[in-house]
Amino acid sequence: MRQRVMIAMALQCNPSLLIADEPTTALDVTIQAQILDLMMELKDKRKEAAILLITHDLAVVAETCDRVIVMYGGEIQEIATIDELFKNPLHPYTKALMDSIPKMDTKEKRLKALKGMVPSLLNMGDGCKLCSRFDPKDCACGGTGEEPELYEVKPNHFVRCNPSIFD
């Protein structure tokens, strides 16, 4: 109820940008659908309005977003259209996120997870932020330990990876 009231109050101001930080967390699916419908109503009625949705829920992303920015450790790791990201995730972290989604068509009981724990943003240091979570050969830096640059791999699809990992 509180989320709906807050969104309704925000929409009364006719914003050109609605920032929604985890708007559906800890909600049952019925209320979650109502919240998402409310936000999509804003998007449909006001063509010049935009919604910045901050979430870890890839199902919500798939249902509501046009473009996606995947972040880790406060850094952009991948940017793509929703279709491109779900069809062709390129960054190892994005692939790991996709692999952590339960699949209905397999008998696999155990979900895949990254090794280790998420490090504190205060203790990440310089260099590649993902080295502690991936084996060197699978890491975005290609095992160099250096923070890769964000580059465009195809029109409107950007990834922060050492190009050598695609060889």
What is the predicted role of each segment?
Residues M6, A50-L52, R133:
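ABC nucleotide-binding domain signature
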Residues L18-D21:
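Catalytic Walker B motif of ABC-type/P-loop ATPase nucleotide-binding domains
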Residues T81-D167:
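Short catalytic/signature loops enriched in Gly
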